[in-house]
Amino acid sequence: MDNLVELPDEFVLPRYGGHCLADVMPAVARSLGLDDREWSGRSAPADPMAALPQARHWVVMLVDGMGRNLVEEHASLAPFLTRMNSIPDMTCAVPSTTATSLTCLGTGMEPGHHGTLGYTFRSPEGPIMNALSWANGPDPLTMQASPTAFERLAEHGVETFSIGPTGFVTSGLTQSGLRGPRYLSVRDEDDIDLRAELVADTLRGTTASVSYVYERSLDHVGHGSGCRSAQWRRRLTWTDELVEAIGEVLTPDSALVVTADHGMVDVPDDHMIIAEDQAGLLADVDELGGEPRTRHVYTDHPDEVAERWRSILADRAMVLTADQALHMGLLGKWDPAMRNRLGDVLAFMRGQWAVMTRQMPREMSLIGMHGSLTDDEMLIPLLYCEG
């Protein structure tokens, strides 16, 4: 099959190698005077993130679901975020989903290297796993054995902290892609002052430090109510207040960078395609993975299945074989050992369309979704300020 594919106008390719989420922690390491090239794979002397300030203490905050387009569209609701300095042209990785993105941030590696290839996908041990709940997941070190960015920073004497929900400290995703830092649990995630106090505590030491802060509520509201709902808009304003509170505790030798793991689109009920109800869509398909906006399709007949999905979905999706996706560089640097995890066919949904499956009934209640290549899902902010 021809590997040349015409990209739909609304699709954005990941900007690996300088303007992607995987490049954030290497940039922070460079700002601390460390040489990141051995572990990030960066070889070019130019630094796309050279605008980041020099600082002894860094706070790296990731707001789940806070796509760049959404922030710009609602700028009046996020005055502090809007005033922050910005590095443009940033994208998340592919697929545009939390598990993949958090592992990119935590390791400084691209998906094809770290191997967390979506929300659900075939685990190294065979069955479809859920990378958030870790259902059917292997030992986290089997999943991702390379040192994380936090572990590499610690090797150079940098203190590292992670500030997040209590239940995440022992999760498979944390232990796979974000392991290493001292974990500071947030028991009341609505308490802005508590979060700011925890950040302030990490800035008091004399040793250089990097503190990772994870905030998830905006994504949760977007999934349940829609990413342009009144509830979402209120939560964006709350998120802006949280970021401002963290900014206010910065010390003169510290800096804050704020980014996101993906954006979001709302999917109307009449744009939800139920796989089991589409004649022929599941023919020769062994398993479905991924999520509604990007499906991993596992099959022994990839060319035939890809053609069938293209015929049925038509202009509602870009359907690729795994070889085509890898040829396009969608997963970045590719480790062939990850091949069994990747779908043999990949369906990237266009517009506001989604492919649902009754095997994953919780999907049916979602309004806001992500995972595909539209600019609303792929473009993320990279904002920063100094103390």
How does the language model describe each region?
Residues 1-387:
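Feature captures the catalytic ectodomains and active-site-proximal regions of enzymes
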